[in-house]
């Protein structure tokens, strides 16, 4: 039997390698997306079965007889032993936000091959390792947060600085995720109704699994899934009824307050009551759509229309995002391969809910592989589109304009022939008014889903349904990361406040938790609301910093794990974390340096990427406009009454331009300052890690004492 298993695993590996090589080496012919789906499945299965288990049992030594914090601290609020399937769902729902949907779509401008390689290789060797090991070290330290662990294991000063940096990054990430949800649900009664219905459904599931039928996860799953499908179905009916639709139609500022209230309340409720069952419910939809997409691709067999490698954009001149393939492809893909945000979840809610140590492999490593699979689906959705359509959707109006004929002409001149009629027909098929410059990645993913699923379910008549269903799916996909992120940031704030006044750091204290939640929601809520009322303010100011800061956080997390492995006497296994850490940090710090370079004449890409250069150009443009206004005012004094009206209008237009440029200048200066702070923090963690690994810095290991699970169970009985 063992021989047969080895033969089976060998053929799985061989199949995955064959498909991977075919995608990499094929030239000049159309390539089916089937090869990427098969290759990804094989690589993930082999990665989990061999590399994941190697790390779990050879490197760190998971012990099923060792009690977890959830068992020891079980308080029914934050520390709750949770079924591993339910906890996997929570972890996946919490980490799988906008990143795996948006990043690969944007990166597709460079072709499918570079993104495919990084998503698959990075996901297995970097991202899944990162999530799993951070979950492990937090579990072994009573579920402590990332910043607190850096403080304990790498020194007070390093930890204190890191805690501030991590909190800043966390606020940026939550506000960005919330903004994506607000934009998706604004004036969308179908989407808002469906997402609103998941709240009572999740609460019912939580009560059902804890009190009505304890442990009956399967029963609750079936009931919850049926109710979810009904809410999706009736959400469409609600959107078609003017009276009902009115109650679920809100603008962005109102939705911003609603999301803040949602995040505030959900972070205070017991995890078994709402957070865990809601994430479990959301995972049904998330995983369901991804699995259906995988089978649909195998059935429809769409071809990649995007080139394997878009050589003309490797230098960073692409219309979708600026920056060369290294480092900005890796920074742009972000969560699809590795994400620092995951470390915050893996050291926030999840380690406090693990029922058994051995579940950490499935929850940590497995959930990241699932997210990497989502990124692969997003990449496929982008690359099966006609390149002309892809660039019409993802290029800014500043590049292609708002006129259909002009946009088609510009894109065709780039080498991707597309006609206005083709764009018009697709726009009509999905029931939209325009698809030009629908940037951000989400509409492109929705288009890809539509083009695949309509060939199996419903035909052309159902393209509008599938498009709007995909938009709804993305909103639900992302919202789960907001509530988990808020709860995690609450723990982080309590860690910081606990250093000032110890009782505030007690996570069992209701009032301390309430204060921390208010601070958390106030911070990310401010940026969210400002972004909702001003397209140039709030979170839009910090948005460009997301990619670099997120990857820096991932690098810092891997360095922390490396330092702990060295203290555990596992130096021979340091390559497991140091190899991905070194690659991620080189790419990220190089990208960070490019973002703070000064203006250079003729260096178009550098000036576009750099916050400092952009701020300098903003200042120069403001000075020019101020001089022009002074000149116009001088002319106005000597002009007729009729000309004065004309001059006044010109002055108002230029003052508005100055206002917009001032917003941009402030945002870029703030981004540059924060980027420098995050890079200095990263360098501080690097120095501490090196010192610990070579024995120059001696800080004792702060692992929690061993508690035997069987003895604990006997005492509790």
Which residues make up each language-model segment?
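Extracellular loop-to-transmembrane helix junctions
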Residues: 30-49, 107-137, 147, 192-198, ...
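Membrane-interface helix-loop-helix modules in multi-pass membrane proteins
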Residues: 20-26, 31-32, 79-141, 152-156, ...
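Flexible loop linkers connecting adjacent transmembrane helices
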Residues: 53-80, 106, 120, 129-158, ...
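Hydrophobic alpha-helical segments and their helix-loop junctions in multi-pass secondary transporters
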Residues: 206, 210, 226-257, 265-267, ...
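Loop-to-transmembrane helix boundary motifs in multi-pass membrane proteins
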Residues: 153-171, 366-373, 439-441, 460-470, ...
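Selective recognition of specific alpha-helical transmembrane segments in multi-pass small-molecule
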Residues: 42-52, 166, 173, 231, ...
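Membrane-interface "cap" regions at the ends of multi-pass membrane proteins
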Residues: 1-14, 46-101, 283, 324-328
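Low-complexity, proline/glycine-enriched hydrophobic segments characteristic of transmembrane helices
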Residues: 240-241, 386-454, 536-537, 592-666
């Amino acid at each position: 039997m063992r021989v047969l298993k080895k033969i089976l695993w060998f053929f799985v590996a061989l199949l995955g390698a064959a498909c991977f090589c075919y995608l990499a080496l094929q030239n000049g012919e159309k390539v089916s997306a089937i090869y990427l789906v098969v290759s990804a499945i094989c690589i993930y299965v082999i990665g989990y079965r061999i590399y994941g288990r190697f790390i779990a049992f050879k490197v760190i030594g998971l012990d099923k007889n060792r009690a977890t914090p959830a068992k020891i601290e079980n308080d029914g609020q934050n520390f709750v032993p949770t079924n591993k399937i339910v906890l996997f769902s929570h972890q996946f729902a919490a980490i799988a936000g906008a990143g795996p949907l948006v990043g690969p779509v944007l990166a597709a401008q460079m072709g499918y091959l570079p993104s495919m390689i990084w998503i698959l290789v990075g996901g297995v060797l970097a991202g899944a390792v990162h999530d799993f090991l951070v979950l492990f070290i937090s579990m072994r330290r009573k579920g402590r947060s990332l910043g607190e662990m850096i403080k304990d294991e790498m020194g007070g000063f390093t930890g204190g600085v890191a805690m501030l940096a991590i909190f800043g990054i966390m606020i940026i990430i939550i506000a960005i995720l919330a903004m994506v949800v607000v934009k998706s649900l604004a004036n969308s009664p179908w989407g808002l109704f469906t997402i609103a219905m998941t709240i009572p459904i999740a609460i019912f599931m939580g009560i059902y699994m804890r009190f009505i039928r304890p442990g009956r996860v399967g029963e609750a799953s079936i009931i919850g899934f049926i109710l979810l499908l009904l809410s999706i179905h009736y959400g469409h009916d609600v959107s078609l009824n003017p009276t009902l639709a009115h109650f679920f139609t809100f603008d962005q500022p109102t939705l911003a307050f609603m999301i803040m209230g949602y995040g505030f309340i959900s972070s205070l409720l017991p995890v078994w009551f709402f957070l865990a069952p809601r994430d479990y419910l959301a995972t049904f939809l998330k995983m369901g759509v991804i699995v259906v997409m995988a089978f649909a691709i195998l059935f429809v067999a769409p071809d990649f229309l995007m080139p394997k490698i878009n050589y003309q954009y490797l230098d960073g001149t692409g219309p979708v995002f600026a920056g060369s393939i290294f480092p900005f492809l890796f920074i742009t893909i972000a969560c699809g391969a590795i994400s620092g945000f995951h470390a915050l979840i893996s050291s926030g809610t999840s380690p406090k809910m693990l029922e058994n140590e051995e579940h950490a492999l499935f929850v940590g490593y497995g959930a990241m592989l699932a997210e990497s699979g989502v990124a692969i689906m997003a990449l496929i959705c982008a690359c099966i589109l006609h390149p002309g359509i892809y660039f019409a959707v993802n290029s800014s109006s500043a590049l292609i304009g708002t006129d259909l004929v002009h946009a088609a002409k510009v894109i065709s001149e780039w080498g991707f022939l597309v006609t206005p009629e083709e764009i018009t027909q697709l726009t009509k098929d999905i029931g939209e008014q325009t698809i030009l410059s629908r940037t951000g990645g989400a509409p492109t993913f929705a288009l890809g889903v539509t083009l695949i699923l309509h060939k199996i379910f419903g035909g052309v008549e159902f393209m509008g349904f599938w498009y709007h269903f995909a938009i709804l799916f993305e909103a639900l996909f992302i919202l789960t990361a907001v509530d988990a992120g808020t709860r995690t940031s609450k723990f982080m704030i309590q860690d910081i406040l606990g250093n000032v006044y110890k009782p505030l750091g007690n996570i069992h204290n209701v009032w301390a938790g309430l204060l921390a939640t208010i601070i958390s929601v106030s911070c990310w809520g401010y940026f969210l609301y400002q972004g909702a009322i001003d397209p140039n303010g709030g979170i839009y100011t910090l948005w460009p910093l997301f990619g670099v800061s997120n990857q820096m956080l991932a690098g810092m997390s891997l360095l922390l794990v490396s330092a702990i492995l060295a203290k555990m006497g596992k130096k021979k296994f340091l390559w497991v974390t140091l190899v991905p850490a070194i690659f991620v940090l080189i790419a990220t710090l190089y990208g960070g340096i490019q973002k703070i370079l000064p203006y250079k004449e003729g260096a178009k890409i550098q000036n576009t990427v750099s916050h400092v250069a952009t701020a300098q150009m903003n200042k120069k443009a403001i000075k020019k406009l101020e001089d022009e206004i002074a000149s116009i005012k001088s002319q106005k004094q000597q002009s007729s009454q009729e000309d004065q009206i004309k001059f006044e209008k010109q002055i108002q237009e230029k003052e508005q331009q100055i206002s917009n440029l001032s917003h941009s200048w402030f945002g870029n200066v703030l981004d540059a300052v924060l980027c420098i702070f995050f890079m200095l923090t990263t360098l501080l963690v690097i120095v501490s890690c090196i010192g610990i690994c070579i024995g120059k810095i001696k800080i004792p290991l702060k692992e929690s004492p061993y508690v035997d699970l069987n003895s604990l169970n006997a005492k509790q009985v």
